[in-house]
Amino acid sequence: MTDILASTEQPPLVRSDMNLVWLDMEMTGLEPDSDRIIEIAVVVTNSTLDRMVEGPVLAIHQSDETLAGMDQWNQNTHGRSGLIDRVKASTVSEADATEQIRDFLSVYVPPGKSPMCGNSICQDRRFMARWMPELERFFHYRNLDVSTLKELCRRWQPAIYKGFQKRAMHTALADIHESIDELKYYREHFLIPSAPDAANGAEKAAE
């Protein structure tokens, strides 16, 4: 896989406060103070998840010493995916990635409007606040974490929970698309809306 810059084709989305910014990062470990970001990708969708545009997919250069400090799981996972080689070859810094991604996102979402969307997104936000703080400030302070629905579904509707199988690719762009697909799955099978007649009846009763 090579790094991907934002598409120059006709955008499938119009700029809106309601658009959602989806994000995933790969890191050398779990601790923001000692580990580093090695890949970042973003996708913007509309509020109903049926239109999207892919943003930059960037390997972020880190030193050989930093990469050598990864545990065996990360060495194996990011070695198999080719990410380690991409990181070594990359000339993109955290500051470069911040600028490219902010420029892309600004086309589709005003600053401070979209929550940060993804799976276990608080972990990405911790790393972003540490290493890419200007990009972190582009987002609303709220998160849209698909993991919340996952944990509720696992406890309340385990049969539905087992119906979504993750591919566990552990590359940033693939993980974003999987998070979007997972939210669509929960919307269809777990977040059951009230029947229209029942909702209308409740509104009339409130009047």
From Swiss-Prot:
Belongs to the oligoribonuclease family. The lineage of its organism: Bacteria, Pseudomonadati, Pseudomonadota, Betaproteobacteria, Burkholderiales. The active site is at Y141. Pfam families: RNase_T (PF00929). It comes from Paraburkholderia xenovorans (strain LB400). Signal peptide: none annotated. GO terms for biological process: DNA metabolic process. CDD domains: Orn. This is Oligoribonuclease. The gene is orn. Its EC number is 3.1.15.-.
